[in-house]
């Protein structure tokens, strides 16, 4: 990624199949998303035209019935657009040896990190079944993004579409941070209804970060803004959740909230460079 040419780095961008099942329809309604989903190359062109770098991934889950874009396709997209893109992979860590061998293979092929979604993958982040997977990732010092908090996926569906919100509690991630102190962790989203817990985990564990994706900044809780301006100013990351929320919308709303001028470049770019190992220094957690 050619960071010197970028104004920001979006740490949370989905590459998705162009499906339209019930879960997709509910998510579009929740996020007020309109229009067709962008193709992978349209995603690249969107970000390049705005001089924004992005971390791209799909999600390996079977709960919603939405097919995963293969990790290999995401990696190939990022390789073809290496000036602006980094590829993360998604693996279901509850698959035991298969998850471990898949992680090993992906790391050997240069994947830059991993994305996990406990509510959709139906596991607690601190379940010991996932620990062999974490051991491989931690040894390679690759970052892991964990979905935390409420899930827009399933909202409004009968039975929440089967999505159990308990799996999004950031206190589960605290255990992982204790047991794998050399593995950089990004807790995705303002973690409603556990925002205080997420702030505490991020403050307490040096390798834990928070991305601000999935919410318009105008809805950020006051305590999140307070800590982003002060004690967590070097641990908060710009993320949009594109295509559900566009960077255009997110950045316009971000301009209107009371973030200090000297903190804005940290959130928009500099903190991401550090956790992603793009600043030429030893990666966080290493």
Where are each of the predicted segments found?
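Active-site environment of divalent metal-dependent phosphoester hydrolases
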Residues: 16-19, 61-64, 93-97, 150-154, ...
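Histidine-centered catalytic micro-motifs
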Residues: 8-18, 145-149, 187
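Generic structural signal for hydrophobic
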Residues: 46-47, 106, 137, 176
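Mid-to-C-terminal alpha-helical segments outside catalytic/metal-binding sites
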Residues: 1-14, 20-49, 53, 232-237, ...
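Active-site neighborhood of phospho(di)ester-bond hydrolases with catalytic His/Asp-centered motifs
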Residues: 8-11, 55-57, 88-89, 115, ...
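Active-site gating/metal-coordination segments in enzymes
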Residues: 53, 61-155, 164, 282
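Catalytic pocket-lining loop regions of alpha/beta-barrel enzymes
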Residues: 112-113, 127-237, 282-285
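Conserved, mostly hydrophobic/aromatic
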Residues: 12, 74, 106, 114, ...
């Amino acid at each position: 990624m050619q960071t010197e040419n970028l104004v920001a780095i979006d740490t949370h961008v989905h590459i998705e199949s162009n499906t339209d099942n019930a879960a997709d329809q509910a998510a579009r309604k929740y996020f007020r998303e309109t229009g067709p989903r962008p193709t992978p190359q349209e995603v690249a062109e969107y970000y390049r035209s705005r001089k924004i770098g992005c971390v791209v991934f799909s999600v390996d889950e079977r709960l919603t019935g939405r097919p995963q874009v293969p990790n290999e396709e995401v990696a190939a997209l990022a390789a073809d657009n290496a000036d602006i893109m980094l590829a993360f992979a998604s693996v279901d860590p509850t698959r035991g040896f298969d998850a471990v061998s898949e992680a090993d293979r992906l790391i050997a092929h240069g994947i830059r990190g991993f994305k996990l979604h406990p509510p959709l993958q139906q596991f607690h982040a601190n379940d010991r079944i996932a620990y062999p997977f974490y051991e491989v990732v931690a040894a390679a010092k690759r970052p892991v993004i964990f979905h935390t908090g409420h899930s827009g996926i399933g909202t409004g569906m009968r039975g929440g579409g089967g999505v159990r919100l308990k799996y999004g509690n950031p206190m589960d991630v605290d255990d992982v941070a204790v047991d794998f102190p050399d593995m950089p962790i990004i807790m995705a989203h303002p973690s409603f209804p556990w925002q205080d817990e997420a702030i505490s985990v991020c403050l307490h564990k040096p390798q834990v970060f928070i991305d601000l994706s999935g919410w318009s900044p105008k809805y950020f809780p006051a305590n999140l803004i307070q800590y982003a301006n002060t004690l967590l100013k070097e641990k908060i990351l710009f993320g949009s959740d594109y295509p559900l929320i566009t960077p255009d919308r997110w950045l316009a709303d971000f301009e209107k909230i009371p973030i200090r001028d000297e903190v804005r470049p940290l959130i928009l770019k500099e903190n991401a460079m550090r956790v992603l190992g793009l600043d030429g220094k030893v990666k966080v957690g290493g």
